[in-house]
């Protein structure tokens, strides 16, 4: 996300429009999940913000983080113009936030022991996922949930306290 905002800052600087974008790395200004409110009140101007981070205010935002939502770039372009994202963007705009760019990351599952292709493959596995709805989906499939910040995933996989992400 840092690199994405850096590209925006570099392009704005090249455009010479009198706007200076300063990036605050490593959660030094706001923690990632605390950025929604400052964006809605004008205290934070730009953020590369996963919408699911604001799901405690707008639960429907969690749907944007579900696996398989977007399959590739072409699908992302179509999806962004579809009814779900139209409604999501209305909520964003009504909160006073403007989307500068849409970004979708292809995601999936990683495992040290088996291939996770279907919900039934999660049964009995200890997994870590991002977002409340994602965790609920995995629990419904029979997985055990290991909560940990993304910064601790690598260590969790090394120590086997986490087998799947």
Give the positions of each predicted feature:
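Flexible glycine/serine/alanine-rich "lid" or loop that lines and gates the nucleotide-sugar donor pocket
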Residues: 159
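An acidic- and aromatic-residue-enriched active-site/binding cleft used to recognize and process polar
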Residues: 26, 150-151
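Extracytoplasmic "Venus flytrap"
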Residues: 1-7, 26-31
């Amino acid at each position: 996300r840092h690199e994405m905002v850096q590209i925006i800052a570099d392009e704005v600087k090249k455009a010479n429009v009198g706007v200076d974008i300063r990036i605050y790395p490593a959660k030094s200004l706001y923690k990632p999940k605390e950025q929604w409110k400052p964006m809605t009140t004008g205290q934070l101007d730009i953020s590369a913000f996963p919408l699911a981070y604001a799901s405690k205010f707008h639960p429907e935002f969690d749907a944007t983080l579900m696996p398989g939502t977007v399959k590739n770039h072409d699908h992302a372009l179509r999806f962004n113009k579809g009814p779900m994202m139209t409604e999501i963007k209305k909520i964003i705009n009504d909160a006073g936030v403007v989307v500068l760019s849409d970004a979708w990351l292809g995601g999936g599952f990683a495992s040290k022991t088996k291939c996770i292709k279907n919900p039934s493959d999660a049964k009995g596995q200890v997994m870590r996922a991002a977002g409340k709805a994602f965790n609920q989906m995995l629990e419904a499939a029979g997985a055990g949930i290991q909560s940990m910040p993304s910064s601790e995933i690598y260590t969790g996989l090394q120590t086997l306290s986490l087998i799947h992400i």
